[in-house]
Amino acid sequence: PGFTDWAMDVFPALLEGDVPFYSHEIDAYWDDIGNVDELRQSNFDALRGAVEVEPGAPEVSEGVRAAVPLDGVEVEAPALIGAEVELGEGVRIQGPAILGDGCRVGRGAWIRDSILLAGAELPAGTFLVGGIAGRLPESSES
């Protein structure tokens, strides 16, 4: 029970116990995501092209991909804006930024160096800098 670290706990125990284990070298991108900052960084690496992924939206300007019109908003690359995203007037998106499908961003909100997970809502006038925002689950009443 408790926290177990592969590098500090598991691998040394295997070596001490003379238990055979194997590794495999890959020539591809790898990031051992262990916290929110590493999750953000991995997503931004993909956004910048360090990882081969299907972007899911057409490039509308250099470094900006969007599946929705960007009328009345300011977007600085790199940025990915998913399908069915609603952007209020005067929204400012300063990359790196990723807005997942179905996000709603209120008028005048500012997003910088952040990720909105699918379905997230950001109220009007909100500043989100260096974060990850998601959708709150529906509360279940017992």
Language-model features, listed with the residues they occupy:
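Catalytic-core segments of class I nucleotidyltransferases/pyrophosphorylases
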Residues: 1-54
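A generic, residue-level signal for flexible/boundary positions that often mark functional hotspots
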Residues: 15, 20, 27, 75, ...
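Histidine- and/or cysteine-centered catalytic micro-motif in compact active-site loops
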Residues: 26-27, 44-45, 84, 90, ...
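Alpha-helix N-cap/loop-to-helix boundary motif
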Residues: 31-34, 77, 95
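A structural motif detector for beta-strand N-caps
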Residues: 57-73, 79, 85-91, 97, ...
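Extended, intrinsically disordered, low-complexity segments
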Residues: 138-142
